[in-house]
Amino acid sequence: MKKIAVDAMGGDNAPQAIVEGVNQALADFSDIEIQLYGDEAKIKTYLKANDRVSIIHTDEKINSDDEPVKAIRKKKQASMVLGAQAVKDGKADAVLSAGNTGALLAAGLLVVGRIKNIDRPGLMSSLPTIDGKGFNMLDLGANAENTAHHLHQYAILGSFYAKNVRGVAHPRIGLLNNGTETTKGDPLRKETFALLAADETLNFIGNVEARDLMNSVADVVVTDGFTGNAVLKSIEGTALGIMEQLKTSIKQAGLRAKLGALLLKNSLYDLKDSLDYSGAGGAVLFGLKAPVVKCHGSSDAKSVYYTIKQIRIMLETDVVGQLVEEFSNRGD
């Protein structure tokens, strides 16, 4: 049985969206147990009876404006901290939260702990592509600054995830750069390129540009945390902007446009689905001793459900256990 600790109080729509997502996951997956951390009375309002779910009551939670490290150290009984502690103590196999991102990163590092020989765990997410296959990208903001050695490790981490969780046999690794030529980039990008090209265990395809990411140019894209976070928010904003612009144009263009939209309804739904990344799950703080997964702060029940599904696959494939062995053998 796979045991997943869930911070029921984190996120804009907690606890309703969190608990409703848990309800659906419990109904669909008979091999998981859920531990809900938070206000018991509020949780019970939305929770369906199930013998594979338990509530660990706490009145304390970490707020969105709390300073991350200070909150983790001072709010020992916060729902997020208790979930991470359950993983450390072996009472849970993974932890999920839609709460304060910085605090969850701190909890992952300070409570759960990183895998030996991994210098800087990276925040990784699955992002949408036009063909619907998606790609993984890291780091998405766990670290403001990175070295070439960190980015090399991210390529290994991302490749492992793509193989074991997404089922990509030979993941194509791309280095995000300002051009595809081998001579492009600043010193960080050039040094990283050399390390990736020299690693025969990776299917490194070279530099990739941001404009090509949604065209499935690579299965895993590696970059520093600052750049990755900016790209992530650009993709999110573009996807939302396209859909809003379509809605506005149809509404303002009159009857003909509305009739045309009706005829194109299935195609428009396909477009919406191709830009919707909620079905891909959450962002993984990869490189820790157990899965620590972050849902978007505005996650609905669907997103929570798919994040639990994602964690279940990670536990089923033992991707973290394989990483521990891999980096133990590398010793770098």
Curated annotation (Swiss-Prot):
CC per GO annotation: cytoplasm
Keyword Cell wall biogenesis/degradation: no
Top-level enzyme category: transferase
GO molecular function, one term: phosphate:acyl-[acyl carrier protein] acyltransferase activity
Chemical reaction(s) catalysed: a fatty acyl-[ACP] + phosphate = an acyl phosphate + holo-[ACP]
Summary of subunit composition and partner proteins: Homodimer. Probably interacts with PlsY.
Protein function: Catalyzes the reversible formation of acyl-phosphate (acyl-PO(4)) from acyl-[acyl-carrier-protein] (acyl-ACP). This enzyme utilizes acyl-ACP as fatty acyl donor, but not acyl-CoA.
Name of the featured protein: Phosphate acyltransferase
